Amino acid sequence: MARLSRERYAQLYGPTTGDRIRLADTNLLVEVTEDRCGGPGLAGDEAVFGGGKVLRESMGQGRASRADGAPDTVITGAVIIDYWGIIKADIGIRDGRIVGIGKAGNPDIMTGVHRDLVVGPSTEIISGNRRIVTAGTVDCHVHLICPQIIVEALAAGTTTIIGGGTGPAEGTKATTVTPGEWHLARMLESLDGWPVNFALLGKGNTVNPDALWEQLRGGASGFKLHEDWGSTPAAIDTCLAVADVAGVQVALHSDTLNETGFVEDTIGAIAGRSIHAYHTEGAGGGHAPDIITVAAQPNVLPSSTNPTRPHTVNTLDEHLDMLMVCHHLNPRIPEDLAFAESRIRPSTIAAEDVLHDMGAISMIGSDSQAMGRVGEVVLRTWQTAHVMKARRGALEGDPSGSQAADNNRVRRYIAKYTICPAIAHGMDHLIGSVEVGKLADLVLWEPAFFGVRPHVVLKGGAIAWAAMGDANASIPTPQPVLPRPMFGAAAATAAATSVHFVAPQSIDARLADRLAVNRGLAPVADVRAVGKTDLPLNDALPSIEVDPDTFTVRIDGQVWQPQPAAELPMTQRYFLF
């Protein structure tokens, strides 16, 4: 019996078990560990759509109606890259959720068809063959300064935004906060028509618990403590006390100037309670020079923002101007200039690289328009992974040499912007991974453009954004091919396929009856018991020390010397600027 060669099989159906794929132009390779579509042994039985192909009536398409359980959409033959593994499978979507990961087709004539992936007349097909599928990005640090950032986020594969703001107000440009019931209501209403899940953070800087509770009833999903509003030990303690009762998360930007205490005082005020530490390295703010040491605390859930990812020869130069603008500083005032300069330290930025590679810093967000770029979360993450592989070699468990594959490193890094922030903020029951039962917030990538620009972005099972050519052309592919909104981005559809994450107290207060919103309000899960060990593949707790005079960083006793990268992948090969 004739058999297909592996090369020919890959040309027809995409990679299979044992094949390796390079991610964009990085040094990262992933190996497919399982093929649930069949593989060369069942060649010809794969679910493939097209003229003369498998998914036709009484062939790969069966008789099952939607009422019989047929999925609304099947993504065929995709390589799934997620924190739990790297496999090839067909993915079934129904009612906006993932219902099956396995083999699709017609069980009347095909073997091994998953019971929830029976293709019928009601089923649409998206080809994932020779493409990669990931979960949509969960950006855990977004300043809602202007609505245009949502366009940029979607075009980069972001499907969930955690943050706050009211527009280009000085408070929003600095602090990621939507303060008070009125602002929360107006922002929840204004965001209703975008095909993105939103979770707004209320202002946590107060010693008045009543002011915190009213924000939870008004639609906040949690709180943000920011030094520009005064992150005092008393405010930290009060906010966490309310959060412990409410079950919500608190994000912290601590006191850079050490006016109300040092990092040890903040750790004392936190008192072992779960907290999300924003820009843990410190360039984005926090106790100078040693806020990075909180990454060694088991109750602290540490994240980075993307402008310091990875450390390059240009990182320091661009940060000073960013700081002056974002924090409303005056370069003619010496104290303001000193404040800005105290936050930019090559040694801690370099240490941030290796702490990510070890899994000691667990998440990456954007800090959009406030010292970060909303469209570069994914790109900066993989640039960091590339730089670390070049400097540190293969991670433990990853083969090197001619059989090199970076599955462990890739799974660690993808978790930083998908499942880890979802767990930290109580959303992982709905989002954060490619798993059955979750919203079909999925991103398809061409391997050559992985992490650079998505091929298709699905929001709740509907195609919301895609790389699309000239609309007046005779076929969809003629240039210019640009990321463009699709039908799933229409306001009514977006509301039907997206949610606002809110505190459970707002559900109890019947917030939906008081808002002009069409989307569902989804209560966040209780996160008060979430610690670093709950963040998959990113739970390392090394010893971290910072010399207060030289800013030298020791990780498990070893000095990590800055070696800023002079060249990166995913840059001028893809972008003009």
Swiss-Prot record:
Give the enzyme's main class according to its UniProt record, as a single word. Answer: hydrolase
Give the positions the UniProt entry annotates as the active site.
Answer: 327 (proton donor)
Subcellular localization, per the record? Cytoplasm
Record-annotated residues binding substrate?
226
Tell me which Pfam families the record gives. Amidohydro_1 (PF01979), Urease_alpha (PF00449)
Highest taxon above the source species = Bacteria
How does the annotated pH dependence read? Optimum pH is 7.2.
What Enzyme Commission number(s) does the record list for this chain? 3.5.1.5
Q: Which GO terms describe its molecular function?
A: nickel cation binding; urease activity
Instruction: Tell me yes or no: is Cell membrane among this UniProt entry's keywords.
Output: no
Query: Where, by residue number, does Ni(2+) 2 bind?
Result: 224, 253, 279
> Primary place of residence?
cytoplasm
Mind listing the UniProt keywords for this protein, alphabetically?
Cytoplasm, Hydrolase, Metal-binding, Nickel
- Residue positions annotated to bind Ni(2+) 1 are 141, 143, 224, 367
The annotated pathway is: Nitrogen metabolism; urea degradation; CO(2) and NH(3) from urea (urease route): step 1/1
On cofactor binding, the record's note says: Binds 2 nickel ions per subunit.
- What are the record's GO terms for cellular component? cytoplasm
Q: Name the cofactor(s).
A: Ni cation
Family statement: Belongs to the metallo-dependent hydrolases superfamily. Urease alpha subunit family.
Q: Spell out the note in the miscellaneous section.
A: Was identified as a high-confidence drug target.
Quaternary assembly: Heterotrimer of UreA (gamma), UreB (beta) and UreC (alpha) subunits. Three heterotrimers associate to form the active enzyme.
- Name this polypeptide is given: Urease subunit alpha
What's the source species for this entry? Answer: Mycobacterium tuberculosis (strain ATCC 25618 / H37Rv)
Traced from the root, the source organism's taxonomic lineage reads: Bacteria, Bacillati, Actinomycetota, Actinomycetes, Mycobacteriales
| Gene name for this UniProt entry | ureC
